[in-house]
Amino acid sequence: MKIYFIVNPMSGQGKAYRTIEKKLEEADFEYEIYLTTASHDATRFVKEKCEEHAGETVRFIACGGDGTLNEVANGAVGFENAEISCCPCGSGNDFVKYYGGADRFSDPKTVATAPVQKIDLIKIGDKYSINVVHFGFDTQVLRTMLKVKHMKLIGGKNAYNTGVVSAVLTGMKNKGKLYADGELLNEDGKFLLCTAANCSHIGGKFYCAPKAENNDGMIDVCAVKPISRFRLMNLINAYEKGEHLDDPRFEKIVKYRRCKKFTVEAPDGFCISIDGELTALNKFTCEIVPAAISFAVPAVNAESKDAQKEELHT
């Protein structure tokens, strides 16, 4: 088996490469480290190596954030000889929260030899999501965070709060019709936020899809109706904790569906997030692709924080 560690050199405040290299010093298997050079470079690299080693299993380990993992997944999909996994080095690392957190994937030697399981992907046009597609209020938060993250005072550790303030001012009412397997979820064509989930977390800490399973052949769609700013402030902590599907305060404002196809029609268009990467669209369809890719999942380390949590996804 060929093993490639695909490192985003900008991740981990520029320390991702040194971190991975040091952890691999005593590795007893052959591997190569590849440093990405531009956006979508990881996708290109994965495709090329899958074709080059067509008769051999090739494992690609994304060392960066959710964006790097997304690029690796997009390169590997469609190749029977491809396996992927990750060593999270980004800031949010939302995808691995589905498996309990980054600790489980922190040792590259363990990740390189972990068993694989088939997981689903969400297809959006010619792109794929391994985690969550989302848009509306929370995408406005993300959009602002990306703009200000390197600025003094309002950026850095304050970037999230700056994003929330911006979204509260400009992202409370969004327009677009939402269809889950043909069912219209919002007759008035308005919504606060919406997620189409394969896994469970977005935005670094929001447990947006607590019932999602990434191997059940279904998309978990959650649409929230527009509400007042005051009500949002009262409910946002419960949404962050993943309580919105059972909390009676959300009963009249949340539409939750499990579907195979989810369509959005927004004549004016807006930004959507595909695993944390923003793109502008006005009409798109998300379709589940069952068992689309082989993903390596290490066992829970008894000494890690993951061992303190219930192991739901094995």
Model regions and ranges:
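Catalytic core of DAGKc-family lipid kinases
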Residues: 4-6, 12, 36, 78-193
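Short beta-strand/turn micro-motifs composed of small residues
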Residues: 7, 64, 225
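ATP/nucleoside-binding phosphotransfer catalytic cores, i.e., glycine-rich phosphate-binding loops
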Residues: 180-184, 213, 223-314
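Gly/Ser/Thr-rich active-site loops/lids in small-molecule metabolic enzymes
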Residues: 149-159, 210-230
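Short Gly/Thr/Asp-enriched flexible loops that form oxyanion-binding sites at enzyme active sites
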Residues: 68-81
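ATP/NTP phosphate-donor binding region
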Residues: 1-60, 70, 302, 309-314
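Glycine-rich phosphate/pyrophosphate-binding beta-alpha loops
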Residues: 134, 138, 193-210, 278
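Short N-terminal binding/cap micro-motifs at the start of the first secondary-structure element
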Residues: 12-16, 203-204, 295
